[in-house]
Amino acid sequence: MELTVTQTTPDQLIERSNRLGADPRTTNYAGGNTSAKGEAIDPVTSQPTTLMWVKGSGGDLGTLTESGLAVLRLDRMRALVDVYPGVEREDEMVAAFDHCLFGTGGAAPSIDTAMHGLVDADHVDHLHPDSGIAIATSADGEVLTSTIFGDRVVWVPWRRPGFQLGLDIAEIKRANPQAIGCILGGHGITAWGDTSDECEANSLDIIRTAEAYITEHGKADPFGAVVDGNEPLPEAERRARAAALAPVIRGLASTDLRMVGHFTDSDVVLDFVAREKLQPLAALGTSCPDHFLRTKVSPMVLDLPGTASAEEMVTRLRELHAEYRTAYAAYYERNASPDSPAMRGADPAIVLVPGVGMFSFGKDKQTARVAGEFYVNAINVMRGAEALSTYAPIDESEKFRIEYWALEEAKLARLPKPKPLATKVALVTGSASGIGKAIATRLAAEGACVVIADLGLDRAQAAAAEIGGADVAVGVQVDVSDEDAVQSMVDAAALAFGGLDIVVNNAGMSLSKPLLETTVEDWDRQHDVMAKGSFLVSRAAAKVLIEQALGGDIVYISSKNSVFAGPNNIAYSATKADQAHQVRLLAAELGEHGIKVNGINPDGVVQGSGIFAGGWGASRA
């Protein structure tokens, strides 16, 4: 094995990783890992030393940078073979990798480090492509591997990731010098090469060959026929139904731990939830460790047709949720040992609704979105396996060993402490500028997902992008005096993040005129925006908060003018007094649902404000 002496080695590795990670057909978010071996000068001895650069624990191939690489001395890493205590204690080897690190900084080595270091090849890729996992989870995967690839790709029976799997693959590489890689049963693929380009080409060869074989030889309808009544609802009806269901489902999914939601109604999802094999395949659960660590072992599936009413769906979802929790607790009890970590929660991470789509949940928007993406990967895997054979994921006990793995628990324990408003969803009206934008910015900084609602869509979207992008903030257009527009705004919040927790009534305007110059039109316009608008927003939001059953907060940005009188602003001050009394009324009414209603009475805020339409801001500055 010839090794190169230059910075080119890690540079090429990063470029290869980014290309592979950019294609969802190749690997999923934060899944898989890549490596390269080469030489560098030891700064202590000034002698060349053989190193391995490998993607570190928790990194994502698509966005990998040099800081995300773990760098190990290859001789020390391979010397661990001599002290390996056996498969029953292989978890101890992860800590041993730290004693093989070269230099300072860099990422922590992952559980797959041994696979890369022990295989006798300069470059190694371990990936989770849909087509490769489809072969890996087929009941006759070993036969299919031989049929599709001949002796170029070798079958490796399922083994949990770790040091022993690295030894197994290294031996397979030695015994099969003609092979370019292997299919890992129930898991994914590994490929290798003498150069970075050759390794990447071999990875893509395995993936594309599997894709082509599935397309050419697979059954046309591997999920069976479309069930009558489960066809996708028309788009507008489907989105409205999803918005109505999302808060209910989010509340159920947050029984143990509050979650943020994500909704997906892609063609892949809608086709799967419409088919006759939906229930039996979903019950089998996912197989690839990266999949079920994000999605849990199986989803919750509504067993009603898409044509059922919203009320029927809600009633049945509540029943199914109770059943799911009982089943998950039983799964934990069946498989747990005295040393197992405590159960992390019995609620579903994925909920499938025929005719509507998929709801996914996580500790933040990104986690919820990625869980949904992983389940789409799982659907593709099931389709490929069923097209060629029968989908056969790894055993339940093996899934549990990974889901409640001590190493996985340790990784979770190392996560930073969540911010105060993590898992909360906030909606702020009039938040593209002024007080509203400042509030939205602070809420996001404290960990909340934020809906920026404003009369101008472009301004709302620009503010959302400035605050943090789609996994943190979304911009929506709303005229708070329009009942339908307000409902659309609340629906958008439900579709974006699953529901609401904090609602800030901030939208406003000011017409500063003496009594005798104030027209009926002025009065009506002022009250439409602030008094009526606050009422409409609070009413629509309260419905969501009550359905979620998670409590919540409604905050009114009123004004000192609601209390103190002054000349030349009767319309504005009267609406502020209206808002102040709405606070008192709603606090009394909504408290039984755990919903707190409060008001803030600030003085004039001019900087960055867009509410002053009549020159009042300039006169008060």
What are these regions (language model features)?
Residues K543, A588-E589:
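Alpha-helical segment proximal to the catalytic Tyr-Lys
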Residues L516, F564-I570, E592:
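Active-site loop immediately N-terminal to the catalytic Tyr-X3-Lys motif
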Residues S559:
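Residue(s) in the substrate-gating loop at a strand-loop-helix junction
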